[in-house]
Amino acid sequence: MANSSGKPATFVLVHGAWSGGWCYGKVAALLRSRGHVVFTPTLTGQGERSHLLAAGVNLTTHITDVLNVFRYEDLRDVVLAGHSYGGMVVSGVADRIADRVAALVYLDAFLPEDGQSLFDINIPANTQRFVANAGNYGGIAVPPPPASFFNVNATDAPRVDALATPFPLAAMAERLSLTGAHLTIRKRTYVHGTILPRESPFKPFYDRVKDDAAWTAHAFACGHHVMLDMPEKTAEVLQAAA
């Protein structure tokens, strides 16, 4: 099944903190089965690249990771999606190469403005907890919370716990520089996972855009990892954005 133009679409799906490209396995398989091209890069210091974790790995590093996928794969007319922290990354990428991005999709993700870091727009209690816990890793990295923190479904929770990796503190602390070019991308979508055992830092972003004509907004009755909890619906939203 192609997109509305009748052609296969190209997707770049960016994961969040403590994760890796592996988290998009279900969604990527669904999209590929419909004839689409899907890239699921793993950010430096995460997943199968966890051996590269270092004090200097920051948000700029991760933006460069994804920019290089576009460069070396010569990607254009891309649906670019980010989950959670990945919203910081895709905002930076899209701002730098807006002419190569056809659509932006935020999957229960941070939606930053110019000059903001993840710490600036997260719930203060979360920020304080992450900084304190980084002390267990020499102040370099934040250990992963359990899957239950994100209300991951019972089937996927054990795998999430097994594969989660410490996340570089500098990536959370670095402020993002945006020119506003990413806002010229006409197709913008936000997906919010509504069921968490605690206050969600992502609901304010959903509330900000849900009635904005420039955005398409969806609320999924699931936890934070929408691509694991509702892969079929996530794939449908991504395909609709193409």
Give each language-model segment a name:
Residues 184, 190-192:
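Short beta-strand/loop motif that positions the catalytic acidic residue
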